[in-house]
Amino acid sequence: MHNLLADRHLDRGAKLLAGALSYLRPELRHPERIPQGGVLLVGNHALMGIDSFALYPLLWRHTQRLPRGLADRFLFKVPGLHKVFHSVGAIEGHPDQAVDLLRQGEMCLVYPGGSAESFKSPAQRYQLFWKDRLGFAKVALRAQVPVVPIMAAGVDHAYRYLFRDKLLVRHVAGQGKARYDFPVSLGLGILPLPVQFTYHVGEPIQPPQGAHLADDPRAVEAFQGLVWRAAQGQLDEAVRQWQAQPRDWLDALGRKLAG
């Protein structure tokens, strides 16, 4: 098994991210629920994937393991961003590579909603865009590893939404045709507003036994639906707790600016 902790470059990347985003006061609740060995973490995405940059250092700190993030290929086309992803062990998402890593006992992290989920409007905050997103379920079934939802509250208030634009996506990613309308938003430059990020780790969800079930559409849809429902319910509860928790002046300011 590849030992991420032995790679000083990855270790340094996690520490740099932790320092840069420390003002968000990110918190990881119930990290003890993450089992040893191969495990597929699934999360909810925020604008520019800023939630994952804060989560990586937390996972490293609490588990002494860095997840292999399975990122949208589109993001690796953004100048400079691919270097940040590689610095913390993230790779372009590919099912075969993910299955191999999980079978080797790695902890992988994927956002089933992908870029579409991270480009949502304020009216769509904390909604999982997982319809027809079956890839993570197939991977978990093939590798026969548990799926653990990690739902983040606060992340959809990290920027103030202004308007949507397709030209920016084509300019940044070099695409002839934009896949998404990019939400032009306001933060602290490219950094998020100072709202606290709170990550809630759910209970592991075991796939039904039999790697062959990854080739059964009904089995894949059933398992995907099971995880999706559990994750959305967990996210709803995480947001309720986040909204009710006491706010310091910095968090209150960030929420007000986010609108």
What is the predicted function of each stretch?
Residues 1-58, 63-96, 164-165, 236-259:
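Membrane-anchoring hydrophobic helices of lipid-metabolizing enzymes
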Residues 1-9, 100-259:
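Non-catalytic C-terminal accessory region of glycerolipid acyltransferases
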